[in-house]
Amino acid sequence: MVGFAWLPPETNSLRMYLGAGSRPLLAAAGAWDGLAEELHAAASSFGSVTSELAGGAWQGPASAAMANAAGPYASWLTAAGAQAELAARQARAAAGAFEEALAGVVHPAVVQANRVRTWLLAVSNVFGQNAPAIAAMESTYEQMWAQDVAVMAGYHAASSAAAAQLASWQPALPNINLGVGNIGNLNVGNGNTGDYNLGNGNLGNANFGGGNGSAFHGQISSFNVGSGNIGNFNLGSGNGNVGIGPSSFNVGSGNIGNANVGGGNSGDNNFGFGNFGNANIGIGNAGPNMSSPAVPTPGNGNVGIGNGGNGNFGGGNTGNANIGLGNVGDGNVGFGNSGSYNFGFGNTGNNNIGIGLTGSNQIGFGGLNSGSGNIGFGNSGTGNIGFFNSGSGNFGVGNSGVTNTGVANSGNINTGFGNSGFINTGFGNALSVNTGFGNSGQANTGIGNAGDFNTGNFNGGIINTGSFNSGAFNSGSFNGGDANSGFLNSGLTNTGFANSGNINTGGFNAGNLNTGFGNTTDGLGENSGFGNAGSGNSGFNNSGRGNSGAQNVGNLQISGFANSGQSVTGYNNSVSVTSGFGNKGTGLFSGFMSGFGNTGFLQSGFGNLEANPDNNSATSGFGNSGKQDSGGFNSIDFVSGFFHR
């Protein structure tokens, strides 16, 4: 937060108004109060029960030993209750500091009005007649900047003072767990490896939930409220990626990066869904890569949906610092402009003010559209049908890409709205070949996936069939580990639930190679389960190496049921690098799919068929048989929409 002094009031004010606010702090204060009450009640009850036992019928050395052992626990509970009360008070103090700062910063609408007014004065300052008014607006803007910085400095000081009052928690008493299969101390639950966890199958400390952490490279994860996270201090599930690394301080699910609020974001400090980059507010924002359009770069600081670039406000813009819808270029204010620093609708060129102008530095009305072959109003591209399109071959409103059907798409061959990637069916997808909503990964079928090739929702990991997985190759949900068939596993290649160990068949195991429940030691043999042939397998009747689930045939990273290949999850898939149900491959280029009943290469969705796939095949949506299609029931190549035959 200390970087606020360098940030303009647009950023400081907007962050204060669009952030989570004081509600999480107040909720935390209430939770700490409740915990303090429970701890004090537990201490009182514990002391009363032990006193009655030792002073009643139970006498002798055993009774005395029990009383001596119980005393420290009662004292620890009392002290912990006092610390919880202090945490509640300081959380309320921090909430009060935020509310005071929120009241003190300039409202974002006031800042935006100042900037727009200044811009209008500047573009109309042909003879310098607006210079005094521009200077006055800039002076007001500088005052806004100073006001926000002063308020944020006070907020930082107050919140830091509140945090400084918190004392370190006293060491807990060792070797006390409530549950089975735990390795560590003071866990309430089963199958945890670590300390102070409330839940099942965690690898780390002080998690409230299950399946956090990953046994892959020993990625310990702590202080999460949720399940299936790789990282620390997340409020949600499925954040992080086993290959990219831990993600922390997220509020939401399926994010890769830090301090995101929402789902399926790749990057840091995003607010929304499916953003690829940093500090975006909205859905499906990313950055264009002009040298290789199929591989987008991160987009930063966008507010809106489906923008490809940086600092845009609106939807479907390609470029930087545009305000409006469907612009291509930089610094445009309006809709459907191609070029830079235009004000209006459907202009082609630079520094124009008006509608449908072609050229530069013009003012007026040039026609309903600029560009060629357009039907509608405010289009500046080529061959568009609709309104305010600056791209080519689009059907809809505010598209700056190519061959889109829908609204505010800055990518190409999308069906839907707010897609900045390629060949997506849905809305708010930042990368390519997704079917669904808010995916910043690629080739996903579902919602809020920042990873790739997932069938399900809010997966930060890759090639999962299920939801809220930060690991890879899982069939199930809430897994931080890899290649599991089941739920809440932070270990590897388990069939079952809440295992922090590896290659187990069952539940709540912190050891390895066990068949059963609640084991903290290692079993014997190369496999767990029943009827497996090979090594490193768990489950039932698998053949090969490194499989979990049942009746899988193959080597490495197969989970689920009746799959064959490599890196496969789900049910009855017969092609590698695939998640979902009943997907198949044909030809040399096959796999890399998600969804249901697809055949071919690089597909997502339902029932898509590419009979002769090659390395240019890519399809999303429903029932398509063409190449690089989005939408539904298309049989020709390179189209979006529906029923192109």
Curated annotation (Swiss-Prot):
Kindly give the Pfam families that the UniProt entry links to this protein: Pentapeptide_2, PPE
Which domain of life does the UniProt lineage start with? Bacteria
A single BP term in Gene Ontology:
response to host immune response
Q: Which InterPro entries match?
A: Mycobac_pentapep, PPE_dom, PPE_sf
- State the family named in the UniProt similarity comment for this chain: Belongs to the mycobacterial PPE family.
Q: What else is known?
A: Was identified as a high-confidence drug target.
Q: Which named protein is this? A: Uncharacterized PPE family protein PPE12
Query: Which species expresses this protein natively?
Result: Mycobacterium tuberculosis (strain ATCC 25618 / H37Rv)
Protein's gene: PPE12
